[in-house]
Curated annotation (Swiss-Prot):
Species of provenance: Anaplasma marginale (strain St. Maries)
Assembly and interaction partners: Monomer.
SUPFAM superfamilies linked: Ribonuclease H-like
Key words, A-Z: Cytoplasm, Endonuclease, Hydrolase, Magnesium, Metal-binding, Nuclease
Free-text cofactor note: Binds 1 Mg(2+) ion per subunit. May bind a second metal ion at a regulatory site, or after substrate binding.
Ligand binding (Mg(2+) 2): D14, D139
Entries under InterPro entries matching the protein: RNase_H, RNaseH-like_sf, RNaseH_domain, RNaseH_sf, RNaseHI
Keyword Hydrolase: yes
Entry protein name: Ribonuclease H
Family annotation (NCBIfam families): PRK00203.1
Cofactor: Mg(2+)
Source taxonomy: Bacteria, Pseudomonadati, Pseudomonadota, Alphaproteobacteria, Rickettsiales
Length: 154
């Protein structure tokens, strides 16, 4: 779905972690409707894979200069199901899961939801390591950030 006046962008995201928790990285490829592309990445020295998956989408959406018609492609069912299904119930339950435990990564879920309200978003799950060029590139960016954080200083 494309809303009138909104630029189209396809976003491919991935997160990675060595150990869980451990050094982690995220990567995103943004493909704009006019043919332009942008790659962004980052990471943290002590994080989890799920935090990196969420951060990848957050940073990609935050990189957009205005409201867009977005297709987010993620290999994380945690991210896709969390934002499209679970978050409504979590909020109604005071950020508790169906088994009454505290929702993890609430800070990131709140920020992701805030950013989703700025755009028209279609969420797609893509199979990891299945040959999708842009998902593979996002994975490479994320893994590069992990490796950068694993280098032992001399």
């Amino acid at each position: 779905m494309v809303l009138m006046g909104k630029s189209r962008v396809a976003i491919y995201t991935d997160g990675a972690c060595s150990g869980n928790p451990g050094p982690g990285g995220w990567g995103a490829v943004l493909r704009f409707g006019d043919g332009g592309e942008r790659r962004i990445s980052g990471g943290s020295d002590d994080t989890t894979n799920n935090r990196m998956e969420l951060t990848a989408v957050i940073m990609a959406l935050a990189a957009l200069s205005g409201p867009c018609s977005v297709c987010v492609n993620t290999d994380s069912t945690y991210v896709k199901n969390g934002i499209t299904e679970w978050i409504r119930k979590w909020k109604l339950n005071g950020w508790r899961t169906s088994n009454k435990s505290a929702v993890k990564n609430v800070d990131l879920w709140v920020e992701l939801e805030r950013l989703t309200l700025l755009h028209s978003i279609e969420w797609r799950w893509v199979k990891a390591h299945a040959g999708n060029e842009y998902n593979e590139e996002a994975d490479m960016l994320a893994r590069g950030e992990v490796e950068r954080r694993m280098v032992i200083p001399k």
